[in-house]
């Protein structure tokens, strides 16, 4: 989770490194939500989050920043991020429903249904 270790951008900046950081933003603590949905379908608590403006964070560190909202945008955004001389954040916005690359909230609920 980027919000648990985003301060390492300052260390990278100080060390002269140029990291490319990919943030998958589904507006939730997805791993916790996945366990809640599997064990207690539709009874979730404390997993929806309001994220900060990651582009503003990128700018604050002098990094390149891009927000991607569709698959077709990713390749070009990633290429630009890799070309950045100062590091970059690429925020990939996904739906909360897409809880992981392999499943959805609906699928978890359906599998847990009696």
Residue ranges and their predicted role:
Residues 1-114:
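Thiamine diphosphate
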């Amino acid at each position: 989770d980027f919000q648990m270790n985003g301060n390492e951008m300052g260390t990278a900046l100080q060390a002269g490194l140029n990291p490319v950081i990919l943030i998958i933003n589904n507006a939730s603590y997805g791993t916790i939500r996945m366990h809640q949905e599997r064990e207690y379908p539709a009874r979730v608590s404390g997993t929806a989050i309001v994220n900060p403006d990651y582009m503003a964070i990128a700018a604050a560190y002098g990094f390149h920043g891009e927000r991607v909202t569709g698959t077709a945008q990713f390749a070009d955004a990633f290429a630009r991020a890799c070309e950045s001389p100062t590091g970059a954040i690429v925020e990939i916005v996904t739906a909360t429903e897409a809880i992981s690359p392999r499943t959805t909230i609906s699928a978890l609920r359906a599998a847990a249904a009696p």
